[in-house]
């Protein structure tokens, strides 16, 4: 391990006092591995630290946090227009860690850290929304977005991904479907959507497999729509397989256009974006990411 190039870890401020992480980094440094550590405090820090990583000449920038941290770091990396672009390493430290979990990143800190530094760097896709923002994992709309956006931080901290489901059940009487129209390559649908998932990755909301067949290096986005007028019957019906379920609509395309007669909100790796018109397109091979050899998200 001692011959591997330098890395820079961008650590979410919520994990700054993580003692096991501090010990894992110390052990690797004792092996001769140079790991720079920078802690985020406010929005925009990740971009500044990626710029610093380039000046330092590191080969890997590690995102230490949840899906939001991974989104910030990966978005900063794909904005690099010239020179060598560092690879992305993943260190899952958030509440749900949906992208890292579905990619097969080890839960053990020391193993995840070693993979982030020394793992094979594979080209993976990202997605751009309305030419101004991006996501690496998934865009979710409807019921799922309102739940993940409104779930209290204390509940998430105490219960992790299960908190989203509990908060959703508590709010069930106020949740209504979104009327919208969705177009893609050889795809057109119009109706009432309770949940919309457009995935580069497979899961969101604390482990919910919204796009179970998505791959991150196939140049496509997977779409899944949960339809219906009433939430509770639709949720029960989704316990069946999608092949037998009239409340589930699936699609795949390099792009999707979404129009709604009223404002709807999409959650992009944890960041809300509201509007009536959305153009979502895949960015093939947008960056390199260090992944396990048996990563289920690779074709």
UniProtKB/Swiss-Prot annotation:
Superkingdom of origin organism: Bacteria
EC number of this enzyme: 2.7.1.-
Pfam families in the cross-refs: DAGK_cat, YegS_C
Residues binding ATP: 40, 66-72, 95
Binding site for Mg(2+): 215, 218, 220
Role this protein plays: Probably phosphorylates lipids; the in vivo substrate is unknown.
Name this polypeptide is given: Probable lipid kinase YegS
Gene from which this protein is expressed: yegS
